[in-house]
Every structure is written in structure tokens, then in C-alpha cells.
Amino acid sequence: MRILLVNYRYFISGGPEKYMFNIKKMLEDNGHEVIPFSIHSNKNVETEYSKYFVEPIGSRDATYFEECKKTPKVIWQMLTRSIYSTEVEKAIKKEIKDVKPDLVYIIHFVNKLSPSVICGAKKMGVPVVLRLSDYFLLCPRFDFMYNKKPCEECLTKGYRTCIK
């Protein structure tokens, strides 16, 4: 099976990336072909598929948003990549068209690639598996915490409660 593996980093920076490279190896050891889709970074593991990767928010040297210079362009990119990115959708559709995966497996896309990776895959008719390892779909902070206390207001009152 050809699997397009989507993550917003293609280098180890923490747990999700360790998981990604471990699952990639396990899948390959079991006879599957695993093809990455990610963001350009100077820290990326080399891959022939980097030609499909999208430009990062800010700089290819920055791993975290805090490392980026907060220009209006960077802030705009951060806001739009949180919601939707035509650039990302176009790039993933191009890679899907060229490599013809049987499945898209998404590890992490939040705030860097956007949900457009899901839309692009669905528009191309490729099934999507989305790994959920935190609460990002339900809580903008990812952890249901506010002022070091449990908070579930987004579940009952919606996202507007996170803007106080």
C-alpha cells in the first residue's frame, strides 16, 4: 500500500515526530511505501518528495512560532493556516496526483498545514486517517486547561469563550 504521511514537521522535534518516524519505519518494514508531505525546514530529513512540501510560516529556520519575527505577513499566515490554506490544498493535491497514494495518514496539521490537507485528499478521492493525540479539535489550547485549572467551556459555550 502507498501511504501519504502528513505532518507539519519532517524532523524530530518532539513526541509526534518520534511517533511519525517510528510508524513510518514499521509500515515500511511491513512492505508499505510511505511518502511524506510536510513543510520546508532546514532541519528536515532529506527526501525526494520535498519538492511537494509547502513554505513555512516565517522562516525555514524556525521550529516554533515564537522564533518567527512577528511581521503582518507572518501573523496573517498563522491565522489563515489555522483555518484553511489554498496553497497547502494545492500542494497536497499535486502530490496525490503524482504519487497516487492509497491512503493519507495525518499525524499533525494544526496551525501549520491547516485542515485543507483533509479537504485536498477528499477532493482527490483518497481515504484519510487522522491521528488524534490531543484535543485540538475541541479546545484552542489543546489541553482543556485555563489558568492551570480544568476548563471545558468550549464544549458547552463554543470557541468564543477562549477570547477573554
What are these regions (language model features)?
Residues 68-75, 132-164:
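Acceptor-binding helix/loop patch of EC 2.4 sugar-transfer enzymes
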Residues 93-113, 127-131:
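Short N-terminal targeting/anchoring amphipathic segment
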Residues 9, 87, 109-112:
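Short beta->alpha connector loops
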Residues 13-14, 82-83, 108:
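Residue-level marker of alpha-helix boundaries and capping positions
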Residues 29-103, 144:
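A conserved catalytic-core segment of Leloir-type glycosyltransferases
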Residues 1-49, 97-99, 117, 121-127:
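N-terminal subdomain of nucleotide-sugar transferases
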Residues 13-14, 43-47, 112-115, 136-141, ...:
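Short catalytic/ligand-binding loop motif for oxyanion handling, primarily in non-cytosolic enzymes
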